[in-house]
């Protein structure tokens, strides 16, 4: 439940257009105006996934801190990890404004940002200055005008290898024309081969092998899911992130804003993304890590992602509506749910509703 102070702050931010409000929230985190969340560590929430130890399973998804401006401040809100980006080799301005739209009745957001970011060098400089031991992932993408998109992903691995705790290859944004074509099997095989080869090359030189995750779309056919699963298992990929935003507008109340082009995120994405998550878990088996994203708005929805097959979960859009207290509320709520379930660990509940979600309509 959003507290009165956060409700007032949200009302103030909602007086501004979404992109301006986003910039104001980044500025507030930079300045220390947002209070840190005090959460007692719960060893039942701690997991080691892809060689990394996460104090709790909740992460901030990519898209909020595009330029690595506030990763440590985000961890202080209660997140167990955070993901910066998407970053591209060269700076780019993205698509014309307006390009973010609130669907308040639906607690959803439509964006067509188009990988607006300051480029590799700006993000690298900021990450190199961090002194903490938190888990910061780097979400890498390709420039819109790139003549060799796979080379852009390879460049991201090379540039951030010394500062990233994990990588995410984002091939599923709907806002860069042709990007989702990299999910097609032949293209995906070429991408994974190139990215993982340079990751292994850098590991030999540095002694640090950085996990690589692949972020996929929710708008996949069954054949598309088959192909991605097959290639994920055929390469030494460290995990999947399921899922990015959707092009679907099914069931929305705000039909005026629903007409805007772009990817939909927030509460309406929960069902679809969770069903795709479960289908992918069925396809890749029990061992490949999966991070579940899409519509996480509470401890209950976070746990439901885990029951559907996720090891970790991420959120972003729902914090637009619930405020910066949401991560702490969810983490405390997960501990309470483990008490209720009499579960010794969060891992013990993974896959407990896998069959239910895998059978749901996508």
Curated annotation (Swiss-Prot):
Catalytic function, reaction form: (S)-dihydroorotate + a quinone = orotate + a quinol
Residues reported to bind substrate: 66, 111-115, 170, 175, 244-245
CDD domains: DHOD_2_like (cd04738)
Active-site residues, record numbering mapped to chain: 173 (nucleophile)
Membrane topology: Peripheral membrane protein
EC number: 1.3.5.2
InterPro entries xref list: Aldolase_TIM, DHO_dehydrogenase, Dihydroorotate_DH_2, Dihydroorotate_DH_cat, Dihydroorotate_DH_CS
PROSITE patterns, alphabetized: DHODEHASE_1 (PS00911), DHODEHASE_2 (PS00912)
Similarity annotation: Belongs to the dihydroorotate dehydrogenase family. Type 2 subfamily.
Assembly: Monomer.
Listed NCBIfam families: PRK05286.1-2, PRK05286.2-5, pyrD_sub2
Protein name, per record: Dihydroorotate dehydrogenase (quinone)
Native organism: Rhizobium etli (strain ATCC 51251 / DSM 11541 / JCM 21823 / NBRC 15573 / CFN 42)
Name of the coding gene: pyrD
């Amino acid at each position: 439940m959003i507290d009165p102070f956060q409700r007032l702050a949200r009302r103030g931010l909602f007086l501004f257009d979404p992109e301006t409000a986003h910039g104001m929230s980044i500025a507030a985190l930079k300045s220390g105006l947002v209070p840190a969340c005090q959460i007692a560590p719960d060893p039942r929430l701690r997991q080691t996934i892809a060689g990394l130890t996460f104090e709790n399973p909740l992460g901030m998804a990519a898209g909020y801190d595009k330029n690595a401006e506030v990763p440590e401040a985000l961890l202080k809100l209660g997140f167990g990890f955070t993901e910066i980006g998407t970053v591209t080799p060269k700076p780019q301005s993205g698509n014309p404004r307006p390009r973010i739209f609130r669907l308040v009745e639906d607690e959803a957001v439509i964006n067509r940002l188009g990988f607006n970011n300051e480029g590799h060098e700006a993000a690298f400089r900021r990450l190199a200055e961090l002194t903490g031991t938190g888990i910061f992932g780097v979400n890498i993408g390709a420039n819109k005008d790139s003549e060799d998109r796979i080379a852009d992903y390879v460049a991201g691995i090379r540039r951030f290898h010394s500062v990233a705790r994990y990588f995410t290859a984002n091939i599923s944004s709907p806002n860069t024309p042709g990007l989702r074509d990299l999910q097609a099997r032949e293209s995906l095989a070429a991408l994974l081969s190139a990215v993982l080869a340079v990751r292994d090359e850098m590991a030999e030189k540095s002694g640090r092998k950085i996990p690589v995750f692949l972020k996929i779309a929710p708008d996949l056919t069954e054949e598309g899911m088959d192909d991605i699963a097959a290639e994920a298992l055929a390469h030494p990929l460290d995990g999947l992130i399921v899922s990015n935003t959707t092009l679907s507008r099914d069931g929305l109340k705000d039909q005026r804003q629903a007409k805007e082009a772009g990817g939909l995120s927030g509460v309406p994405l929960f069902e679809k993304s969770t069903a795709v998550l479960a289908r992918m878990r069925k396809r890749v088996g029990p061992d490949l890590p999966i991070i579940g994203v899409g519509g996480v708005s509470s401890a209950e929805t976070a746990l439901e992602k885990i029951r559907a097959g996720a090891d970790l979960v991420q959120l972003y859009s729902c914090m637009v509506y619930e405020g910066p207290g949401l991560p702490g509320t969810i983490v405390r709520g997960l501990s309470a749910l483990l008490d209720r379930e009499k579960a010794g660990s969060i891992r013990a509940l993974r896959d407990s509703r896998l069959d239910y979600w895998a059978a749901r309509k996508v």
